């Protein structure tokens, strides 16, 4: 069924909660360091983060660890700033996880509707009628 395909795929590559959190957290850390992030600096970071997040979900909290290399190379984050990013990420990770799971469910419903398949099996429908 559609759900059997979409939900595991979404758990692997759909990490909207982590991505949003990491972008906003990196902007906050940059501003605390006295640097104002611009659209020209953030757009390449967001694109690279999107690619990185596909490979990140192998371990819990893996997104922030995969992002540290980008932050160091693109924004010259120091080890203190990287530690702050890890702390911020772990403090709010449950909210990002809730966003990811809700998004996966919504995408599964949309794909199910797109292919005009019911999420209720025929056997269950017969038992209801």
What function would you assign to each model-found segment?
Residues 101-129:
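Cytosolic juxtamembrane C-terminal amphipathic helix followed by a basic/polar low-complexity tail immediately after
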């Amino acid at each position: 069924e559609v759900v059997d395909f979409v939900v595991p795929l979404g758990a692997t590559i759909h990490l909207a909660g982590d991505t949003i959190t990491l972008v906003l957290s990196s902007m906050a850390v940059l501003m605390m360091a006295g640097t104002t992030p611009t659209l020209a600096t953030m757009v390449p970071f967001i694109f690279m983060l999107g690619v990185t997040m596909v490979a990140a979900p192998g371990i819990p909290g893996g997104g922030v660890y995969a992002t540290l290399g980008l932050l160091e190379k693109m924004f010259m984050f120091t080890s203190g700033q990287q530690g702050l990013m890890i702390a911020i990420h772990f403090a709010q990770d449950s909210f990002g996880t809730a966003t990811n799971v809700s998004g996966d469910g919504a995408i599964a419903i949309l794909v199910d509707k797109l292919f005009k398949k019911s999420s209720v099996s025929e056997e269950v429908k017969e038992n209801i009628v």
